[in-house]
Regions:
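N-terminal acidic leader/helix
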Residues: 2-29
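Hydrophobic beta-strand residues in large extracellular and virion-surface proteins
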Residues: 3-5, 26, 35, 57-58, ...
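Short non-domain terminal segments
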Residues: 20, 32, 66-68
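Short, basic/low-complexity N-terminal boundary segments at the transition from targeting/disordered tails
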Residues: 24-43
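Short, mixed-charge low-complexity intrinsically disordered segments
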Residues: 40-72
Length: 72
């Protein structure tokens, strides 16, 4: 399945509130497996939320919160 992926890395440091945002088109049948592969097994916590138009995955990795929004 082809998705538009918005990957946002949230920065909670008090002196740097900028966010890193990456947008790309990806093809995958399993968004959670895609995220696990992308973050190379460094995930401390993974939450998956199905939406009518896609999937949102929150991953805590190396102390940072990554939000992956897969939209059809």
């Amino acid at each position: 399945m082809e998705y538009e992926l918005v990957h946002e890395i949230k920065n909670h440091c008090p002196n740097n509130q900028m966010r890193d945002v990456f947008i790309e088109e990806v093809e995958t049948d399993d968004p959670a497996a895609f995220v696990r592969e992308r973050l190379q097994g460094r995930i401390d916590e993974l939450t998956v939320a199905e939406r009518p138009d896609g999937v949102t995955i929150l991953a805590v990795c190396d102390g940072l919160c990554h939000e992956f929004n897969f939209t059809l």
